[in-house]
């Protein structure tokens, strides 16, 4: 009985209110911790205290590695840090990491599902040196074309914006690279809904441009970039526009052989003049070929894309409004290209006619026995 009464009293002790007396301190609880001590230092586990802070190159490399993180905010913040580091570097100073090292990590972000990441990626692209981008155009184009044909509409628009930046930086390299001309034009036809000969047989092949406001802005961007792409590929060169007007005033057509072909015998301007032969690469089809000259690009364009793009621009013009104004830029480039191509063809006809009338040919210049 004594032990049970003691246990019962201890249990009731927790539910009884203690009586405080004047001048007597309150009792301390059982879990009381004494914090009256003083310490000159606080030691934390797993803490590294170093006198030297990480260098800017180390931080740059660290943020490059974070671009493959699964967190959208972390990828966006890393892109912002890289953009700030590149933009704030001294003039004519090299990048903390070469473009060839950074670019393979940046390219998959063109297809990123987060809009903020893609927007920050475009800002980073614009901060990179333009001279370094020209050498990496063949690596950029496959990701851009994949974005232009993506199922998500916002990713398609972002890819078109990246293509606009790339044309502004290296337009000649874009249209003359392997697959950069035909494959990119096919992507434009897919985005705009302008079909080629295979799908033109369907009656409902006409794309609708009657969207106003914010819904029509993506289509306007695509038409604007299409005009830029056509201007880079088949736009009439400013320094060669006068050659067409010189046909009747003793121009190149009036020169004798070999003066009329002097440019063929000079040192090439390009770094790899025989790359179009593809001597040591894998066999390529017509879409994967390199079209480095204006004549080659215009020949392929007139045979495969001219009618489809003319039909699409005419439909956009008939819709009127913002779409009609946006299509006027591409229509202007197309008309100038057709006029320039007609002048080139007339010049070739006049040149061949003059050679025939003079009776001068390559066989006439060969030594006779």
UniProtKB/Swiss-Prot annotation:
Keywords: Nucleus, Ribosome biogenesis, rRNA processing. GO terms for cellular component: nucleus; rixosome complex. It comes from the Eukaryota. One of its GO terms (biological process) is rRNA processing. Pfam families: Ipi1_N. Disulfide bonds: none annotated. It is found in: Nucleus. The keyword Nucleus applies. Residues 1-10 have a biased composition (Basic residues). Residues 1-33, 349-369 are annotated as: Disordered. Component of the RIX1 complex required for processing of ITS2 sequences from 35S pre-rRNA. Component of the RIX1 complex, composed of ipi1, rix1/ipi2 and ipi3 in a 1:2:2 stoichiometry. The complex interacts (via rix1) with mdn1 (via its hexameric AAA ATPase ring) and the pre-60S ribosome particles. PANTHER family: REGULATOR OF MICROTUBULE DYNAMICS PROTEIN (PTHR16056), TESTIS-EXPRESSED PROTEIN 10 (PTHR16056:SF2). Belongs to the IPI1/TEX10 family. This is Pre-rRNA-processing protein ipi1. It comes from Aspergillus oryzae (strain ATCC 42149 / RIB 40).
